Amino acid sequence: MREFSFLRKSPDCVSVFILLYSIEEIRKGGFFRMNITVYLGANEGNDTSFRQAVEELGRWIGESGNALVYGGSKSGLMGALAASALAAGAEVTGVEPEFFISESFQMEGLTELIVTKDIPERRTKMIELGDAFIAFPGGTGTLEEVSEVMSKLALKQIDAPCVLYNLNGYYAGLKALLRHMVEMGLSTEEKQEKVSFAENLGDIKAILGAEK
């Protein structure tokens, strides 16, 4: 987990002992705290079930003891997600490019706000912070973000679950496209093995191994 990243720099016997002891204690409790990076739209959309589902997702992140990483905006579905996660006690990290800050899009009350110079740096930082990735319904920006995650998974540059929240069939077309890529020999099941589709929050819990 991210709490033990210091071991990459200077592992020693004491540090390894602490790590192993901590992992054992966490396993006894059956829970690993995750930074869950969520990609989603800054608009509401015209399906009222989106807001209800995103608030449910935010509440679960907080109530389960996990932390949220998202794009930092107060607008639309992004704002609803952050507000519900904060209300449920989650640590919430927003990652926003500086030109959004100047336009006052940032959410108030975040645990941490990270400002990046541009969109590419924002994508990099959100991946760097995440232990798991969820793509909620969103627009082309959301598609760009989750596509980079899938690409890095295929190249084995990261190793983490990537869940596309197929709410009301929103990502059915993308699911079919990914399958078609395999059929046409342009991708493989191995390259897509970390990519999953969830129909509801229960599916997400099961995929992330956090069903309680």
Regions found by a protein language model. Give the residues of each.
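Short loop-to-beta-strand entry elements in the cores of soluble alpha/beta enzymes
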Residues: 160-168
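Short, structured loop/turn "capping" segments at alpha-beta junctions
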Residues: 92, 156-160
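Cationic, low-complexity basic patches in intrinsically disordered or flexible, solvent-exposed regions
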Residues: 4, 10
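Active-site/ligand-binding-proximal alpha/beta "capping" segment
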Residues: 123-155, 163
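A cross-family phosphate/adenosyl-ligand binding-site feature
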Residues: 33-129, 167-202, 209
